[in-house]
Swiss-Prot record:
One of its GO terms (biological process) is glycogen catabolic process. Phosphorylation of Ser-15 converts phosphorylase B (unphosphorylated) to phosphorylase A. The modification N6-(pyridoxal phosphate)lysine is found at residue 681. It comes from Bos taurus. The record marks 156 as: May be involved in allosteric control. This is Glycogen phosphorylase, brain form. The gene is PYGB.
Amino acid sequence: MAKPLTDGERRKQISVRGLAGLGDVAEVRKSFNRHLHFTLVKDRNVATRRDYYLALAHTVRDHLVGRWIRTQQRYYERDPKRIYYLSLEFYMGRTLQNTMVNLGLQNACDEAIYQLGLDLEELEEIEEDAGLGNGGLGRLAACFLDSMATLGLAAYGYGIRYEFGIFNQKIVNGWQVEEADDWLRYGNPWEKARPEYMLPVHFYGRVEHSPEGVRWLDTQVVLAMPYDTPVPGYKNDTVNTMRLWSAKAPNDFKLHDFNVGGYIEAVLDRNLAENISRVLYPNDNFFEGKELRLKQEYFVVAATLQDIIRRFKSSKFGCRDPVRTSFETFPDKVAIQLNDTHPALAIPELMRILVDVEKVDWDKAWEITKKTCAYTNHTVLPEALERWPVSMFEKLLPRHLDIIYAINQRHLDHVAALFPGDVDRLRRMSVIEEGDCKRINMAHLCVIGSHAVNGVARIHSEIVRQSVFKDFYELEPEKFQNKTNGITPRRWLLLCNPGLAETIVERIGEGFLTDLSQLKKLLPLVGDEALIRDVAQVKQENKVKFSAFLEKQYGVKVNPSSMFDVHVKRIHEYKRQLLNCLHVVTLYNRIKKDPTQAFVPRTVMIGGKAAPGYHMAKKIIKLVTSIGNIVNHDPIVGDRLKVIFLENYRVSLAEKVIPAADLSQQISTAGTEASGTGNMKFMLNGALTIGTMDGANVEMAEEAGAENLFIFGLRVEDVEALDRKGYNAHEYYDRLPELRQAVDQINGGFFSPREPDCFKDVVNMLLNHDRFKVFADYEAYVACQARVDQLYRNPKEWTKKVIRNIACSGKFSSDRTITEYAHDIWGAEPPALQTPPPSLPRD
């Protein structure tokens, strides 16, 4: 009888190293047909378009798994410091094309699919966006995952596998209507369920103090089931993991609560536990304070920390037994980055595990926690800051409330010792806010419990230091940093704008795709006639393509020779879509007043979602669609001005509209947009920016030269001065006839003849309580737009500025951002050693 295999031999038998890569066209075809038959159980007679998409997805996924396993093996062998990026949002978009691009498979797949009589682009369109985010925060997390994999960092994204992502937006009679985003309806070929790593998460219960320590008892348990999605780096054979948790009820859930007859009710009530991962809260920059949301925040943190500690304790290859019992080295092996305050409970939860479970003494546990955690602040808007009622914690997380009180007491003792007698400072710096309803300030908890706190653009980090966390900065100035946001050039150039990428590669090679600073090599070519021609031609092709898409999707005809003026982002008062509306109405009035004048034709596109409960944002959408209805059907205006609301703006739509844009609108009130990343995407794709000195616009102007952007409006210090003086919108309304005309038309029902009073509340807000000072910037904005028109009339000079902007956008790669995080915050340098491809032997 054959001798039984050793563990090592058995592992070699199922190793992926022996599998040949499927890079060539014939292999892709073969694999595609195999999946169509054996995975999907279809033949070409009955297969649907979705079957073809799934067959291709599985074919491409086959290329990932070897690298994925190999990457994880290598991490277990080398035991590098792990980076854990905790976020309640990951706005990933589609996966198929990104995976083909990062693995260098796109050409082979394109040819194979063509030979099979199918169209690759058509199949790509079938994939649902993974819309597990609201906007910038979630998309940043997705770009960061791409960069961490491309840099070879041992990084993991941890979040929630929402059954329903950000709602689908329909426009009905000009109003936003929300539809559920059932993105998992047809299954998700990119994820792998990992039931063997399912973990319990506790809620409610009571706290018992005894000589042996503290116990949290009589809790309700919900299980967290992990689903893993591969995150491939760009052509480096590294594949990292995004692990998303899904809530499952335990098998005995509620059964003991019922008498003999209650079995069916108990099974039906399992839904209550599983609701935790049901839906993404659709609020952007707004705190609502719902108990289910707090449950989501604790759920992801509790499951993730158990997973992190399991991996820390058994972090050598092939070993599931605990090998580390001491937590001394925990901060040397683990970095936890908190993406905003949503995962703030990681701080008290790590303390609970260390003190209650692992029996580490408090001071040591606190030192470990602080060295491990770091916090990124994403907003300065007061309504966005998370402040949870103490009463909710008392009920839901009683042990964590105790721990937060203890953290706060020690913190305040420290402050009192440094600033004796300064009672107001203690009040300002406390984690607990006193008042009618006692609240926990999660941002304060994050600052106290982290070794590093960063803002996301230089101007924002300055506001964080001087205003939002001024007292904390005075206490620990060395803790505060800036890390200007970035975007991945793989998705936001190579994937979405292959024509422009190719034009650049022809001039400077392809090194810029992993070192975006190399775009500087284009600077000497700014005046090169051939480059000017090629860049302009690519832009025109993108505009023609997007025009065809608009006609097909929305039945809207636009003139691709007009200026594409694009304003796409979440609908929010601070982002000032209303300022754009006032300019559009002003242009309309000018055309009507003198139709014989030479106007630069414009297609104004505005897109974005409004939070379902945000009345003013929904009114803004209605206003845009109403203005469009009048302007677009006015025969005197004709082709010179069109206003289009881009329905259901999402990652996959951004990938189409951004490469086609001529003008990028980034017009938030100075001091309100933390960074913005859409601004960077437009810059990289050859649009010029009209914007205020806010967020990353400031650094874009610094990189490219302010004369190569259209900068207008109040600066932060002007806004502050206006606040001190008192902002009076009526001054501008009375002084500026064009503004007054536009406002009166909106107020009087000119754009809403069937509902003349529709926009009275909008105008009332603008005149009497506009926090974001739309009228104060109107005059400068309209004048700046005239400069835009003037330059657009000179295509060559316009394109020169475009090339200069592209050449100066290198700073805004998320690779640069992540390299800075790794060096300055995580203490984990990107490795020089790449992961060998799965077909090479391990060293």
